[in-house]
Regions:
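Conserved small-residue
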Residues: 119-120, 210, 227-334, 376, ...
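Surface-exposed, low-complexity loop segments enriched in small/polar and acidic residues
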Residues: 1-2, 6, 14-18, 28-30, ...
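Short loop/turn motifs that connect adjacent beta-strands in outer-membrane beta-barrel proteins
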Residues: 10-17, 52, 86-101, 117, ...
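Outer-membrane beta-barrel signature, preferentially recognizing the C-terminal barrel domain
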Residues: 32-34, 109, 132-178, 208-231, ...
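Surface-exposed extracellular loop regions of Gram-negative outer-membrane beta-barrel proteins
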Residues: 2-26, 35-68, 72-89, 161-164, ...
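Extracytoplasmic gating/loop element in the C-terminal half of outer-membrane beta-barrel translocons
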Residues: 310, 362-454, 459
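Solvent-exposed loop/turn elements at secondary-structure boundaries
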Residues: 92-160, 178-215, 253, 257-259, ...
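Flexible, surface-exposed loop regions and adjacent strand-edge segments
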Residues: 33-41, 72-78, 120-128, 195-204, ...
Length: 469
């Protein structure tokens, strides 16, 4: 069910007023016992003065069945302001150069009621199957048990995000050059997550849902387009874009063992990589005549100390307690999600020929190679080996800059730990597309009833420039 009222009118030739009010009620049946239901109202009011000053107000008041009474509806307002500077009289002397200049800013809130994990009606506790029971002398009578699953939460409500944006649109020489710049900031509050710090003595079989997490995200976007025709034969079209976005976890319900340690996610980006800091490879000088680490060198507790050998990775004792354990893991590198994404390209035309090229790249993105038992020779059986297998530490090749540390005929647990030794910068610049085309003259194609025909050859992912190996 949906109903809408709209109003549009211009007063005195310079006052442009628009208004809209919407009611929406939806029921969606996907085959479950109960259909999904939503309800809400929305409104918009916009005012433009003399095609120069623009203001717009929006709101949404939405309800969700997932929450208890008193928590089901959320109010989400938004406001946008714009100033078309190029329409001002004082811009007329430079109108041949600056054909469009607009300043704009927005602020708004949005909501999310999708809890996740296929969870509906968060205020109702669930009942799940549990262990079975058998009776009788031969245990022939068999029945499944039932127990409480996720406990209902009455104070769960909408997850919200507050978005702020400021931007500028600039057009030069009647649109031959167009530049768009946006700066943005987002703050997400009351994120749905299952609590990890509830003690087992509370009696919950499964973690309890709560509005707990907070995340901030900020960055900027830049895009540039250039179109120019030099003469009847030559023309060029070029574009470039650049996006930078950085997020930070402000609040998260971390396990008690993580709080206050180097492994805490608070204050770090979402998906932050964690690992040990690799200082170097052990050398013969680090061991005594019995093959044990010399006094003063922190013990590494990832395998039997007697298994440590020259060529194994030496890690930093971050907390200075005299031994290296998982507690010494810390934030390393960044995240697998790139913070920088960019691209640029151009198409040059000469008469009926055109040549186009497009590059794509990312920056500030990292990856930890491998994982447990991935080192060659770690009792993995028959299979392919890496082409750089010779770039490894051996007594005859005791270099510190080898790719592989010491290998053995069995797994070397010490060297398989997530650490900066395996951290790689995954930034790259790629020649994404290269295309050469030729448009057949219309005097040829019209003779066979074809309005236009273009022949082209295209290559994709032809070159990649990266420090990764």
């Amino acid at each position: 069910l949906e109903g809408m009222f709209s109003y549009n009118r211009i007063f005195g030739k310079v006052h442009d007023v628009n208004a809209m009010f919407l009611y929406n009620q939806k029921e969606y049946d996907n085959g479950d016992a109960l259909p999904y239901r939503t309800q809400g109202i929305a409104g918009r009011f916009s005012y433009t003065y003399d095609s120069r000053y623009v203001a717009e107000l929006n709101f949404g008041y939405n309800g969700s069945e997932n929450f208890a009474k008193g928590k089901r509806f959320g109010f989400f307002p938004a406001v946008a302001l714009g100033w078309i500077v190029s329409s001002e009289k004082f811009m007329e002397p430079v109108s041949d150069v600056i054909s469009n200049l607009k300043l704009r800013a927005t602020w708004g809130k949005a909501g999310n009621s999708n809890i996740g994990g296929n969870r509906r009606f968060a205020y109702i506790s669930t009942i799940v199957n549990t262990g079975s029971y058998r009776w009788g002398t031969d245990a022939e009578i068999y029945r499944l048990g039932r127990s409480e699953g996720e406990i209902g939460v009455n104070n769960l409500t909408w997850e919200t995000v507050t978005k702020m944006n400021a931007g500028i649109d600039l057009g030069l020489w009647n649109g031959s050059v167009n530049l768009v710049v946006d700066v943005f900031k987002e703050k997400r509050d009351d994120i749905f997550m299952q609590r990890k710090n509830v003690p087992g003595s509370a009696g919950f079989n499964r973690p309890v849902w709560a509005n707990y997490g907070k995340v901030e995200n900020q960055g900027f976007d830049v895009s540039l387009n250039v179109n120019h025709k030099f003469n009847s034969d030559w023309a060029i079209s070029a574009m470039a874009n650049y996006t930078y976005a950085h997020n930070k976890v402000v609040e998260i319900d971390e396990p008690a063992a993580i709080l206050g340690t180097y492994r805490s996610q608070t204050g770090k980006p979402i998906g932050q990589l964690f690992g040990l800091i690799a200082e170097r490879l052990f050398t013969e000088d680090d061991f005594d005549e019995n093959g044990m680490l010399k006094e003063g060198i922190p013990a590494q507790k990832f395998s039997d100390m007697s298994n440590l050998r020259p060529g194994d990775i030496k890690y930093k004792d971050l907390n200075g307690d005299g031994e290296v354990t998982a507690v010494d893991k810390t934030a390393i590198g960044g995240t697998r999600i790139p913070e920088i994404v960019y691209g640029f390209g151009a198409t040059v035309s000469y008469k009926s020929f055109d040549l186009g090229v497009f590059f794509q790249g990312t920056g500030k993105t990292y990856q930890l190679l491998g994982g447990e038992t991935w080192l060659p020779g770690s009792s993995l059986g028959a299979g392919n080996i890496y082409s750089n297998i010779d770039d490894r530490w051996t007594p005859e090749n005791p270099r510190q800059d080898v790719f592989w540390p010491r290998m053995g005929d069995k797994a070397v647990a010490n060297n398989e730990q997530a650490s900066t030794w395996w951290l790689r910068d995954m930034s790259f610049l790629r020649l994404k597309n290269l295309e050469l085309g030729y448009t057949l003259p219309q005097r040829w194609t019209t003779k066979i009833g074809i309005r236009g025909c273009r022949l082209f050859a295209r290559g994709t992912n032809l070159l990649t420039f990266s420090n990764f190996k």
